[in-house]
């Protein structure tokens, strides 16, 4: 699973002109399931997302998590995070989980974040979405963990 986290002042996602999710101060998490994602992988990435200290404390240092600051998370599925762009000019998405597996992984990630005490809004899996955000920083972090244990934590 890959999770691209952006610290935001606010963010929203809409499908066909209808807002499906919105947050104020918090995180926008772009999420991509990969084949073989396990509950352990998904849980670890959700915990890391919830606990990553990327918000400033009183001294101006990144020392607080989204939980610490009372922020929310907007989760948006984005299979293009696994794009292979090394060969030719058209990206390949063959490393993305199949749709039904990707949906299950995405839903499990959102459930795990809620289990960490976070309020989560979402986009609509598989839909063409418009995402609006106001970056705070900007501060963007890429988390990637595979079922075989490879990847950053």
Regions found by a protein language model. Give the residues of each.
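Residue-level signal for inorganic ion chemistry
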Residues: 45, 76, 139
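GST superfamily/GST-like fold recognition
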Residues: 119, 126, 130-134
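A short, glycine/Asx- and small/polar-enriched loop/turn
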Residues: 71-73, 133-138
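Compact, glycine-rich, soluble single-domain proteins
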Residues: 18-70, 80-111, 116, 121
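RNA/tRNA-interacting regions in translation and RNA-turnover enzymes
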Residues: 9-11
């Amino acid at each position: 699973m890959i999770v691209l986290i952006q610290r935001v002042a606010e963010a929203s996602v809409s499908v066909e002109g209808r807002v499906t999710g919105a947050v104020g101060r918090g995180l926008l998490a772009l999420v991509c399931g990969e084949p073989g994602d396990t509950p352990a992988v998904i849980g670890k990435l959700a915990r890391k997302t919830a606990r990553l200290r990327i918000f400033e404390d009183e001294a101006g240092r990144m020392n607080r998590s989204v939980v610490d600051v009372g922020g929310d998370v907007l989760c948006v599925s984005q299979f293009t995070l696994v794009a292979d762009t090394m060969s030719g000019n058209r990206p390949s998405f063959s490393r993305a989980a199949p749709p039904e597996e990707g949906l299950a992984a995405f839903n499990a990630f959102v459930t795990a974040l809620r289990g960490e005490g976070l309020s989560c809004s979402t986009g609509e899996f598989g839909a063409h979405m418009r995402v609006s955000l106001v970056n705070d920083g900007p501060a963007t972090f890429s988390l990637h963990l595979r079922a075989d244990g490879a990847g950053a934590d």
